[in-house]
Amino acid sequence: SSAVSVAAATRRTIVLRGINFDFDRATIKPEFEGVLDAGVEALKENADVRVQVAGYTDSVGTDAYNQGLSERRANAVLEYLSTHGIDGSRLSAVGFGETNPVADNATDDGRSQNRRVELNIQ
């Protein structure tokens, strides 16, 4: 969790490593709640920042469908943060669909990495 705190204090974007979504899903898996809880603590320690929750998808599916899916993923994380003590006025959610991949969409592993959410510090 200290790595998340440092990231919150020193970087403009926090990549929630390990928070990846199943194909065609926007449900947060229970095994990822620890990472999100560390993010909650980092945000509580940095109460002056606003956060944009940005959702992404892999390249499978239409642009329009992936846009909606990325928005649902961002909203799922926003809801988690707000129900765990982060004031909703500090949070916004946006979906970027399949844009800005962090890995190669030609492989299963790459697609898995691209099904993600990032926190952008504002």
Predicted regions and their residues:
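Periplasmic OmpA-like peptidoglycan-binding domain that tethers envelope proteins to the cell wall
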Residues: 25-34, 44, 52-122
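N-terminal targeting leaders that direct proteins to extracytoplasmic destinations
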Residues: 1-9
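Short amphipathic
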Residues: 13-17
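Histidine kinase transmitter module recognition
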Residues: 20, 42-43
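Short secondary-structure boundary/capping segments
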Residues: 11-12, 109
